[in-house]
Structures are given as C-alpha cells and as structure tokens.
Amino acid sequence: MAAEHPFKNILTTLPKPGGGEYGKFYSLPALNDPRIDKLPYSIRILLESAIRNCDNFQVNQNDVEKIIDWENTSPKLAEIPFKPARVLLQDFTGVPAVVDLAAMRDAMAKLGSDANKINPLVPVDLVIDHSVQVDVARSPNAVQSNMELEFKRNNERFGFLKWGSTAFHNMLVVPPGSGIVHQVNLEYLGRVVFNTDGIMYPDSVVGTDSHTTMIDGLGVAGWGVGGIEAEATMLGQPMSMVLPGVVGFKLTGKLQNGVTATDLVLTVTQMLRKHGVVGKFVEFYGEGMGKLSLADRATIANMSPEYGATMGFFPVDHVTLDYLKLTGRSDETVAMIEAYLRANKMFVDYNEPQTERVYSSYLELDLNEVEPCISGPKRPHDRVLLKEMKSDWHSCLDNRVGFKGFAVPKEQQDKVVKFDFHGQPAELKHGSVVIAAITSCTNTSNPSVMLGAALVAKKACELGLEVKPWVKTSLAPGSGVVTKYLLQSGLQEYLNKQGFHVVGYGCTTCIGNSGDLDESVSAAISENDVVAAAVLSGNRNFEGRVHPLTRANYLASPPLVVAYALAGTVDIDFEKEPIGVGKDGKEVFFRDIWPSTEEIAEVVQSSVLPDMFKSTYEAITKGNPMWNQLTVPEASLYSWDPNSTYIHEPPYFKDMTMSPPGPHGVKNAYCLLNFGDSITTDHISPAGSIHKDSPAAKYLLERGVDRKDFNSYGSRRGNDEVMARGTFANIRIVNKFLNGEVGPKTVHVPTGEKLYVFDAALKYKSEGHDTIVLAGAEYGSGSSRDWAAKGPMLLGVKAVIAKSFERIHRSNLVGMGIIPLCFKAGEDADSLGLTGHERYTIDLPTNVSEIRPGQDITVTTDNGKSFTCTLRFDTEVELAYFNHGGILPYVIRNLAQN
C-alpha cells in the first residue's frame, strides 16, 4: 500500500462561485506559519512544489522546512530538490534530447530492461523555431522561399522529431513556421495554473534555451537548464538546486515619452550585472508595475541570462489576467487561475495593502529616469546612451582590441571603401550598418516596439527616406500574431518599403542564422578590413555570433533598428546630425521620424485583438502542408542510419554495464586549451555556419555533403561526429597558446605542433593522454548549450579549472562527468605562473563516499607546483551523477533496477 502523503492534512477544496468545485490544492495558508507571508512570491512556488511532491524519498519534509525558513537557509546555500511541472524544448536543443532518449531506450533494451520505461513523465512541448535561415530577404516571397529551403535542409531532422512525437507519450511538437518558442510559450503553452487529475498547482517550467525566463513575465517560474538536466527532469528526476537568494527590484514612476521597453531592459540589465545576481532570483514589485504591460515584463524577464539571474520574476496580478484574456485563454480558465492563486497567497492585488516581503537585497529604479540606449559592440551589458553613441564609437575604434575596442589606427579611421553593388555605386566605412534585423524572442513579442518600428518606417517613407539596398534588412516575428496586427494596422507595407519584409517565424539573426551577405559587400568588408556593424533587436551580441563579418554588433529596440538602417551607420549623433535628406532636399532628423508614446499606444489599442491569438493558435497543431507530408515509422526503437550526417547514435552508452564506474581522478593530463575570461558556450560549441576549412567541413565533404548543404552546427546537433569536430571551433576563439592569433587551433604540447583543436584532442587520445582546460572568469556564459559539455567530454577533457563558471554550464559539465574546479579567490592561471605547458594531476579519492560537495582539492603539475582548488560538485546528487559517469547513465541504471 502506498504511504500516506505527509501533507494530506492541508489538501483543501477550491469551491467555484455559484456551486461545484475547481479541484483540490495543497494550501499554504493551511500551514498556519507566519514565515510564509514574508516569503517572496517566487519562493512560494518552490515551496508548493516541494509540499506536493513530498514522498520522503526524492523530496522530504526537511526540504519543505528549508524553503519555509528561506530567510535563514538561503544565505547558507542550502540545497533543495525541485520538480518542474513541464519541460520546454526548441529544435536545436530538442533534436539532441530526443536522440539521447532514443539511445537511452536502446541502452535499456541491451541491459535487458523495458525500453518503454524511457518516456517523459511530465508534459514536454517542443517548438521548432531555430532552423529557419535568412537566405531570402527584401522580398515579398521571403517567408515561403526560406521555409522551403528550411524543409529541404532539415527534412531528416524534422522527420526524426515527428517520429519522437509519436514514439514518446506526453510530447507535443509544434511544427516549423509557427513562431519563436518563448513567444509561443507566453501566448499559448503557458498554463499559469495546472489542474491535473483534480489537483491544482502553479505552472513551472524548465527549458533547454536560456531565454525560457521570458515566461517569468507571466508569473510562471521558468528558467533555462542544460539539455542533459531537461532529459533527467522529463524522466522524473528532481532537479537539485541551491535555494536561491532573491533580489527585490522595486519599480516606481513611468517611462518618459519616446522611451521603449528595450531601453528599460538594457538599463535593468546593466544595473543587475553591476549588482551581481548570478544564481539568484530577481523579483519585481512596486507601484511602477501597474504601468508595465505584460509584453514589457516579458521583455525584461527574457534577458535574465544577460543580467546573470536564474529568473526575473513578475508575480501574477490584474495585468497578467488581462493578458491571458487578450491571448485567447477562456474566461473560465482565467477565473480558475485567479481563484487558485488568491487562495494560495500567490496573487498580487495592488488595490489591497501589501504585506512587506523579505528580500536578500534590494534595488530600485524610477522608470522616469530611463533614457534611450543601445548595447554593444560585443556584450549585452555594455550599455551606451543614444546621445553618447558617436563618441563611444570613436573611442571603440581607438581602444586596443577588447570588449570595447577595435584598435583601428587613427589614419585609417575615416577611410571610405567604394564598391559596385549590382551596377550601382556603393560605399562602406567603419561603422557602416550591413545587417539591420528586427529579430529574436526578446522584442518581437512586444506590440509597442514592433508597431513603433513600423511607425518609424512609415514616417521615413512619407519624408522620402530609404534604406540603402546593400543593408541586409529582415523582420522575423515571434509568432503569426505579429503579422496579423502589422497588417491590421496597415503599417506592414511601410516596413516592406524599407526592406523589412517578413523572412520567417523563428530565431534568425540573433543566433547567427542571418544568412550570407551579398558577395560584393562581403568582399568590400574583408578585403579592406572594415569594422562593419549589425544592429539587431536581439539579446546577444557576442563576437562572431551574429555574422562572422560584423565585428561590431549592437542590441537596440526595433524602432532604433529601423532608424540605424536608415542612417546606414552607427557613427552618428542622432541629436545633432541628420539621418538623411528627404524628397524635398530637406535634412531629416531622428526627431522627425520618432513616434510618441501616445501614437504607439493608439495603434496597439486598435490593432492587437484577441481573435488574432485564437485563430493563430488553433492552426498550430494542424501543422502546415510540408510538415503534414513527412512520413515517419511507428516503431518505439529508432532505426539509426549509419550514413546519416544529421542523426547519429551517440557513443555515451555503448559499453555500459549495471555497475557504476566510480569517480575518476586525473593523472598527468595535458592542457588542451588555455583561455582568459568570458569564454561563452558559443566559443565552445558554435551554433552558426560551418567554416569551409574546419574538421567538421572535412567530415561532411568526405561523406558527399556539398558545401552549400553544410547547414549550421546547431542543425547538426543530432550527430556527435560533427559536433565533436565543431567543439572549440568558433573562428573568433582566443587561446593563450597561440600568442594573440585568433581561431580554433591549439598547440599539441609534446610536439609543439599547431593543430585544429579536434585534431590535437584526437592525437592526445591516441597517445593515451587525458586533457584538461584552463580558463578565467565566467567560463561557459551565454546559451544553455549542452554540446558545450558533451563536445569536450567526447574530446577527452576530464576537468575544467576556471576562476568562475556560469550556472547552467557548470551543471552541464557535471552531467557529462567532467570535473569543474575553481581557483581560490584572488588566484588564476597567470598569478600561479601556469602557462598550460605543464602536466596536471588532480587528486580525487576513488570512493565517492569520501568526496564532499565543495571540498578543497589539490592540483599538482609536473614541474613541482601545487595549488588548491574548490571542487564544484555542489550537491550530494551531483556526486552520485559523477560516480555513475554522468546524469544519463545514472537515470538508466536507476530505471533498469526498479
């Protein structure tokens, strides 16, 4: 007989007004504990989950007490389990996840167990949005042409995902062309409150995309995790996490006329980066909340990874309920959501007196003080006020190469490169805009900035301004709803006239899917070493990400993207210099094309309608003709095609037995790479184009794949052979072994040969040598890319020694059995005199019971140096994963035994 639920005494019925009941719920007020009223709303969601899932095995009563006592336990970095309500995937991360699930089924069968035990136990939603590329732009047929090319390139991947949606229960696949995962999540998938088998509970989600945090704007707790962790969550494993501190961020006042949500989010990002919020939740509150639309909140929540927080959370209030109605959720559903959240102390009513909540630290921003700004040229938190942009650009040209520098000699700063663009004279200078993209989940779901951009285009058309034809302009909305309201407003035609045709519904320029520049433009840039610029309404602008030829990349609001496209350069002072000359020969200034807040609000009010959301999402599950024509087998085990260059059986479980291998130390390892600070997951495992001379290109060419069909690294994440070769393959990666030379090569220490990283790793492996990686601060920042851990593991990397790790990447390394070590405060490779030419031994006990989370570990080198590091296995559960050789073997053995 099943044991009684430890908290069954607080299971309470929620009555419906007018009779009947909505269901039952675990009532926080019924605990009669005064500490709950002081808890941040985001922590209450963790508390409810712990109570509901308490079985005194995966989650115990002590965990519940830790969360109730959050004020005292969070500073001690207490560990808690968390079981999210659902999992969200996109196709770049979803394909390798489904590949792993399929391989796990094979492993279960080989161990003599039931393969069907490998099945998601919570709802899994997979939105295909990362495969569209901007091959065709500035054309009314762009959407159809790009989609046809997308299907041609990705036929096999899409077929595999369609197989997954039938082979696994509880998995919804949203077909390509439907929109960006986070916007679809916000407008359609987000439940806010679940009612399953008569039990009600708050929606919560983990996603294999770091911008999953966008859903926090809807009052749903959600954040990005590695694909490896997401797979374990699907299979019923609790996530182990440190109970986070919560930064209370008070908003007062309201935004000034002409200031956008993007200006606000870039300001908030800079403030929070400065405050230091890594590993923490940020919870927004204050009277300024009522002035923030839900789309504005979602924009701020979306950029949590850029300010470093786990979440940027906006509790549910009346604004949330209005948005749920606007997006087509039924009145009955919204009434149920409100009733549950009010009854369980999770609803904020600003008309009632507020109980003062306790936060770990506090920040405050008067919205009235936010000014127009952009961020760049190489990092999202390097904010530049619009009025200071020209002088900032000139100092970037002067400064030595770095996050704010290009080191262009003074005498070359004003050079003009003239070239022929399809028969017409064209010119480029340093700072010329060659890509202007309204793109990414951050902004394309926000009607005020999207319609604002369209109004800028309209005013420019009326004044006779035109974007130069050599600027690659594009518009990639987050969902079909955007197209509907742009058409309803009559403004899409003006965006089209300026070259901003819709190119597709998905992630494009922001993740490097910007497509090629015109050959004449590419040649002008590379032959003359021009520092060309991209301006995009995205959330990431790390070097080499947007496009290999745009060395300066600025994040800006959609209306500013249009303004910079019209100006054709970032080297401009919008207050003093004209953007261009109008049809009557008069100079046109920024202020002439910039819409007022009232103008924008009026268009939003008349153009964004509930029926648009309903009709868009009713069509989603029906798919589209190209998707519906894909035929897939109906077997529960996948039949791998050994010749496939997209889907390949991974080697992780090949020789697996029922006995865990135990912890591995590291003996006399060579250093594969020696890095400085801010190495992103993009540097480790790029998502964009496959360089023609790279080991991955060589592999594909040997298998008969033409260069034009290489597709991107992101689209080939279902093939470990390609991805291992693509590890550390970013063309902008800086490795100290190369003394200033940039690119994906390293030195094979024993011979001194300079080789591609993959070839060097292969050489070490064939010689029987382990390898490690040395790194600086913020190692693994950026996207939640599990291949940034899988790739190094396949290359034979046994440990990474860094000054600090980004949260998701550290847990991914643990998940793949790689040891993360941190230098002691104030120390790093340079201060310890390490060049990377040494051999490294990491002394670890061979019995896992003798290892403690966070303990000191001694590292010795062959030249007699030794130093102490902190072992970054942060929890007992992570040590168990390490003992099993990673999280997935741990799950397989557990399921096979039960």
Curated annotation (Swiss-Prot):
UniProt main location, coarse: cytoplasm
EC nos: 4.2.1.3
Binding site for substrate: 90, 209-211, 540, 545, 703, 784-785
Reaction(s) the record says it catalyses: citrate = D-threo-isocitrate
Entry's Gene Ontology cellular component terms: mitochondrion
Gene Ontology MF annotations: 4 iron, 4 sulfur cluster binding; aconitate hydratase activity; iron-responsive element binding; metal ion binding
Cited function: Catalyzes the isomerization of citrate to isocitrate via cis-aconitate.
Protein name in the entry: Putative aconitate hydratase, cytoplasmic
Cofactors, names only: [4Fe-4S] cluster
Listed GO biological process terms: citrate metabolic process; glyoxylate cycle; tricarboxylic acid cycle
Source species: Oryza sativa subsp. japonica (Rice)
Entry-linked SUPFAM superfamilies: Aconitase iron-sulfur domain, LeuD/IlvD-like
Species classification: Eukaryota, Viridiplantae, Streptophyta, Embryophyta, Tracheophyta
UniProt entry tagged with the keyword RNA-binding: no
Record bears the keyword Acetylation: no
Annotated S-S bridges: none
Location(s), subcellular: Cytoplasm
Leading EC class: lyase
InterPro entries referenced in this protein's UniProt entry, alphabetically: AcnA_IRP_Swivel, Acnase/IPM_dHydase_lsu_aba_1/3, Acoase/IPM_deHydtase_lsu_aba, Aconitase/3IPM_dehydase_swvl, Aconitase/IRP2, Aconitase_4Fe-4S_BS, Aconitase_4Fe-4S_dom, AconitaseA/IPMdHydase_ssu_swvl
Textual note on the cofactor: Binds 1 [4Fe-4S] cluster per subunit.
Family statement: Belongs to the aconitase/IPM isomerase family.
Keywords: 4Fe-4S, Cytoplasm, Glyoxylate bypass, Iron, Iron-sulfur, Lyase, Metal-binding
Biochemical pathway: Carbohydrate metabolism; glyoxylate and dicarboxylate metabolism
Chain residues that bind [4Fe-4S] cluster: 441, 507, 510
Domain of life: Eukaryota
